[in-house]
Amino acid sequence: MKKLIQTIAVAAMMALAIVSCKKNQETIADEPQETVKNADKVLQYIKDLGFPAESIVDNGNEFVVEEDILFPKNMVVPFVTEGPKTEQYYTGSIVNSTNKLNIRVFIDPSMTSMTSEINSGIAQWNGVPNSTLRFNVVTAAPYDILIKDENLGSGTCGQGQFPSGGSAGALIKINKSYIAGNSFAQRARTICHEFGHCISFRHTNWAARGESTATNVPGVTGTDASSLMNGGQCNSGATVLSTKDKDATAALY
């Protein structure tokens, strides 16, 4: 009798284990489908912002446009109410009035050797007149932006995410070894530029680079050769925010 009870108990445990494994397998199977569905939404959102399909690069867990703008496939897609936004210097999705007052930046250990450059880039955005936009470095979670080193290959100095859901873009990748030989001012410029993407700015020189069409931030007109947000100018571009960069920041924030 005792042996029979033990046999039944073992059988029950095996059945439970099989059911548990099957349930876990079903959960795992569902997750990729949800990821694919959200990736499709993100892809459509990018197109709605005005980026042509041929400019969108699938890079595994994210989409990349204009070489240094990131859209994670798992991002929360903002609700677009006005149809395609085909012409703009910014995405139309900005950091909200509460979050802009304290955008918390966490420096990954891989980037601590460039802390001074990061602080320099932050100081430029924090110093814009008539703007309440503020970045602050924090040493632990919670944080809004993670800045880390990543090998992005030759020709790409950094990448940054656009804002989503009222929060700043959550990630900046810096190709640290690639820009290490640049001057301090140019390294800080790269980092400052990527912070600009995190608060919604696109490349000021989009037309010259053949990127998707854009219009000015309201009240800030014309091209700007001095803009720090010009793309394709790693190690050669402006190292300080131009007057128009500052005017655009004040207009949005």
Located regions from the model:
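Catalytic zinc-binding patch centered on the HExxH motif and its immediate surroundings
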Residues: M114, L146-L171
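Disordered inhibitory propeptide/activation segment of secreted metzincin zinc metalloprotease zymogens
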Residues: N24-S113
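A short alpha-helix/helix-coil micro-patch that ends at or immediately precedes a cysteine
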Residues: D108-N136
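The catalytic-center signature of Zn2+-dependent metalloproteases
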Residues: F184-A185, R189-K244
